[in-house]
């Protein structure tokens, strides 16, 4: 079984470096333009999104009008009252300091959810995937999955976050999970684990 984890394209919040999890933003113009330059040659799979505007729109740009399913458990973490605010706007508030200086895997932002709460719902949903699937979701969601699957890498969830429009390919074969990461800079998948065959994406020509 092969699972592709692809992060949605850029939004206005990404460009302005704002906390954006539960806020249902569409892609920005720049995000749409960047995605229009990417082509993934992936066929005969199930397509799945988190159901948020930015993931649904990303899927339609990358794969056209393919039928797809949605699962809200793959939504980004809810930052509560920190949503749509920047670090500079929040850094001096006691609520933000209590969250950012502690264990924010456990700490809950006001009106939001902790990283651990998000991780549990995401992994519950991920465990239900039983066929070749393209999952268009969010940076924090992908990072939570990768950190869970590859603890031996000693990476934080933040280290695992891919760039917008990029992601990972996971192959589950003979009970062994292998992984590769696609970067838009090189426009290819680079090998992350032993004996993994890289796949190459091409630039969209029309």
Residue ranges and their predicted role:
Residues 2-69:
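Active-site-proximal alpha-helix that buttresses catalytic centers in soluble enzyme cores
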Residues 3-4, 45, 128-140:
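Generic beta-sheet signal
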Residues 11, 141-142:
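Short active-site segment of divalent metal-dependent hydrolases/proteases
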Residues 26, 66-73, 153-162:
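Short hydrophobic/aromatic-enriched beta-strand-loop microsegments
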Residues 42-73, 98, 150, 171-206:
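Conserved histidine-centered catalytic loops in small-molecule metabolism enzymes
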Residues 49-50, 120, 136-137:
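Short beta-strand scaffold positions
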Residues 62-121:
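Phosphate-handling substructures
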Residues 152-178:
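Domain-level recognition of soluble alpha/beta enzyme cores
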């Amino acid at each position: 079984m092969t699972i592709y984890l692809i992060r949605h394209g850029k939004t206005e919040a990404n460009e302005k470096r704002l906390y954006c999890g539960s806020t249902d933003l569409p892609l920005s113009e720049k995000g749409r333009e960047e995605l229009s330059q990417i082509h993934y040659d992936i066929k005969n799979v199930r397509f799945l999104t988190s159901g948020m505007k930015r993931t649904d729109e990303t899927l339609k740009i990358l794969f056209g009008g393919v039928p797809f399913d949605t699962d809200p458990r793959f939504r980004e973490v809810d930052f509560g009252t920190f949503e749509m605010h920047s670090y500079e706007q929040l850094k001096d508030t006691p609520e933000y300091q209590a969250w950012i200086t502690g264990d924010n895997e456990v700490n809950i932002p006001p009106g939001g959810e902790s990283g651990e709460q998000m991780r549990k719902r995401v992994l519950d949903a991920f465990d239900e995937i039983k066929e070749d699937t393209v999952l268009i979701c969010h940076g924090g969601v992908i990072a939570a999955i990768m950190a869970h699957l590859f603890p031996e890498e000693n990476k934080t969830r933040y280290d695992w976050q891919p760039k917008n429009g990029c992601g990972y390919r996971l192959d589950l074969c003979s009970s062994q999970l292998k992984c590769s990461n696609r970067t838009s800079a090189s426009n290819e998948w680079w090998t992350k684990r032993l004996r993994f065959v890289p796949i190459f994406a091409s630039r969209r020509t029309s």
